[in-house]
Swiss-Prot record:
Organism annotation: Roseiflexus sp. (strain RS-1)
Swiss-Prot/TrEMBL catalytic activity: 3-phosphoshikimate + phosphoenolpyruvate = 5-O-(1-carboxyvinyl)-3-phosphoshikimate + phosphate
A biological-process GO annotation: chorismate biosynthetic process
GO terms, molecular function: 3-phosphoshikimate 1-carboxyvinyltransferase activity
Pathway: Metabolic intermediate biosynthesis; chorismate biosynthesis; chorismate from D-erythrose 4-phosphate and phosphoenolpyruvate: step 6/7
Residue numbers annotated as active site: D319
Gene name as annotated: aroA
Entry similarity comment: Belongs to the EPSP synthase family.
Top-tier EC class: transferase
The name this protein goes by in its record: 3-phosphoshikimate 1-carboxyvinyltransferase
InterPro entries, sorted: Enolpyruvate_Tfrase_dom (IPR001986), Enolpyruvate_Tfrase_sf (IPR036968), EPSP_synthase (IPR006264), EPSP_synthase_CS (IPR023193), RNA3'P_cycl/enolpyr_Trfase_a/b (IPR013792)
Keyword Transferase belongs to the record: yes
């Protein structure tokens, strides 16, 4: 197990080129796999989760070549996937498992089993199994279909309407991928807020999809070769950038710039929260790349204040909440996080693990059923912490070590490889000692 020790640097300075966005990297592989033609994806995230997606798609007969962060996908068309000869191992990636389940569900006659590591096998899957079954899909798994391994038997899918009970981009995307193979349009209503990368990419690939929030309607393509391949450069991942934003805001002598960040409005919740907390943030060089808005974000040392994070903001920053909780511990006043019960079913129970780690650092934190209450202003002290195999926690505790007095020791530091393999190298470069 990788152990890493961190002590506070004198200052933080640097310009950081971010790894490609994790959500977009996943979707670029999956959607181009069923396109008619070849696509090139640059700045692809080479973290373990996205590599799991590549491996699973290759097992479905799709030819993929990767050189560093450049990936070429030769699409097989909507009906050209091949039945896998072995179990599809999704590793730690919920996105891989859930979106693939939607895609395979519409491959009539195909049989596949989707599984993953112990963490993924414990995460709830009924959230995709139930709506996919409503479209005519055949899925089953442990605990009445709630846990992987999931067995998926491709079937004739129907259109119709479905109301999403939770704001989950993975659930929404699984249904939209399944709808590509349906016999009639699919209309989604309810909690369709959250990341909209799938909708943007499908539209760019020629799929008839309309979004009139909260209503999304997708009409299945008439032909198996109807999807145009979509070459793109994955913009910088705002969920990874958020660690540097918080680091700069809470360190007493810091200025960090993250370049080429995805500024999709469904992904900028962390920026909005930090602005509300009083962070000094400057966004420059805003532009459109492909179907996504991007820009450069500079954050400087700031005096933060406590806020309430709740409601519609939560889906826009769900992955950034652990590091925002750290920012709250360094702020003046009380921060309340609520409506974030989804944190309970991430790679770890992030409410429990984040609260425990912050408490070990000297913060005053009260976990609740759907969030936590953080009393800011405490002087953090170094501690021995554990990532519990969770990449977001590993990076959160690393950032804490930049401001906590003494030495912070992190067990399971290698978990960062899931989404940000270069993290430790960047940290060493920007921390001036």
């Amino acid at each position: 197990m990788m152990i890493y020790s961190i002590t506070p640097p004198h200052r933080l300075r640097g310009i950081i080129d971010l790894p490609g966005d994790k959500s977009i990297s996943h979707r670029a592989i999956l959607l181009n796999a069923v396109a008619a033609g070849s696509a090139e994806i640059t700045n692809f995230l080479t973290g373990a989760d996205c590599l799991s997606t590549i491996a699973c798609v290759q097992a479905l007969g799709v030819h993929i070549e990767r050189q560093g962060t450049t990936v070429r996908v030769d699409g097989a068309g909507l009906r050209g996937l091949r039945e896998p000869v072995d179990v599809l191992d999704c590793g730690n990636s919920g996105t891989t498992l859930r979106l693939l389940a939607g895609m395979i569900a519409g491959q009539e006659g195909m049989f596949a089993v989707l599984t993953g590591d112990s963490s993924l096998r414990s995460r709830p899957q009924q959230r995709i199994v139930a709506p996919l079954r409503a479209l005519g899909a055949s899925l089953d798994g442990r605990q009445q279909g709630n846990c992987a391994p999931l067995a998926v038997r491709g079937a004739h899918l129907h259109g119709g309407a479905y109301e999403l009970p939770i704001a989950s981009a993975q659930v929404k995307s699984a249904l939209l991928l399944a709808a590509l193979f349906g016999d009639a349009p699919l209309t989604l209503t309810g909690r369709t807020d959250g990341r909209d990368h799938t909708e943007r990419m499908l539209a760019a690939m020629g799929v008839e999809i309309t979004v009139n929030t909260p209503v999304i309607r997708l009409t299945p393509p008439a032909h198996s070769d109807a999807l145009r391949p979509l070459s793109l450069r994955a913009p910088g991942d705002p969920s990874s950038a958020a660690f540097w934003w918080v680091a700069a805001a809470i360190h007493p002598d810091a200025e960090l710039t993250t370049t080429g960040v995805c500024l999709n409005p469904t992904r900028t919740g962390a920026l909005d929260a930090l602005r509300a907390m009083g962070a000094q943030i400057e966004v420059t060089n805003q532009r459109i790349e492909g179907s996504e808005p991007v820009g450069d974000v500079t954050v400087r040392s700031s005096q933060l204040r406590g806020i309430t994070i709740e409601g519609a903001l939560i889906p826009r920053l769900i992955d950034e909440l652990p590091v925002l909780a750290l920012a709250a511990a360094c702020a003046e006043g009380e921060t309340i996080i609520r409506d974030a019960q989804e944190l309970r079913v991430k790679e770890t129970d992030r409410i429990a693990t984040a609260a425990s780690g912050l408490t070990a650092l000297g913060a005053t934190v009260e976990p609740t059923s759907d969030g936590m209450v953080i009393s800011g202003g405490a002087r953090l002290r170094g501690a021995s912490l554990d990532s519990h195999g969770d990449h977001r926690l590993a990076m959160t505790w690393a950032i804490a070590g930049l401001v906590a007095s003494g030495e912070t020791t992190l067990r399971g530091a290698g978990a960062v490889d899931v989404s940000y393999p270069e993290f430790w190298g960047v940290l060493a470069r920007v921390a001036e000692r």
